[in-house]
């Protein structure tokens, strides 16, 4: 469903190519993360259209949406723990830290309001 560059060794390898959403999972929010992943799956066209790659962060490891552990190193600028999700823009900067529950419309509206995304939408017409 999501394209994933398995050659990446660091989140910065996605810079200028993809936006990244990281869902932080702890023993206290498993249901929220599961719900968020299901929402993403049912909105795959919205996710893909915006060049979003989704990861889950659990026990200091980034996992793909298929649940496979990656060797990708998490940026030191990201929090070690968080009860929510983080959006990283194509420029590599943190664009949002939002608590659960995850709302796809909130995410897509935020992305669509960004200058880079507006430029992408104009060039895709």
Per-range role (PLM):
Residues 2-125:
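Non-catalytic interaction/Regulatory regions outside core domains
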